[in-house]
């Protein structure tokens, strides 16, 4: 008689919210770098010595992100001036994402919010 055992191993991703939070923290401490002779060096001296290469565990970027608040046709950014905030049709239909859309589009770019109410009348061709 013999015995048999099977082992199965697999990798599993962590919980999405935990991974997202870890990425957000790394994003907030990301290092602007220059690529010199195959190495990445901090562009601005913060807590690191500019002569010391960036650590492999650091999140690094080579250039600043464009300002998406401003019109920039070169990169296809339409800016936020004059854009409509996303809203649901009824009070119960507004998600948290929709409720925060004005803040994302306007106030985070230094713009104010102008509220307008539009009433649309249409014929439904009803027959009684």
Swiss-Prot record:
Gene Ontology molecular function: cytokine activity; frizzled binding
Xref: Pfam families: wnt (PF00110)
GO biological process, alphabetically ordered: canonical Wnt signaling pathway; cell fate commitment; neuron differentiation
SMART domains: WNT1 (SM00097)
Highest rank taxon of the organism: Eukaryota
Keywords on record: Developmental protein, Disulfide bond, Extracellular matrix, Glycoprotein, Lipoprotein, Secreted, Wnt signaling pathway
Localization, UniProt: Secreted, Extracellular space, Extracellular matrix
GO cellular component terms, semicolon-separated: extracellular space
Transmembrane helix in keyword set: no
PTM text: Palmitoleoylation is required for efficient binding to frizzled receptors. Depalmitoleoylation leads to Wnt signaling pathway inhibition.
Family that this chain belongs to: Belongs to the Wnt family.
Function text: Ligand for members of the frizzled family of seven transmembrane receptors. Probable developmental protein. May be a signaling molecule which affects the development of discrete regions of tissues. Is likely to signal over only few cell diameters.
The protein, known as: Protein Wnt-8
Natural source organism: Evasterias troschelii (Mottled sea star)
Gene: WNT-8
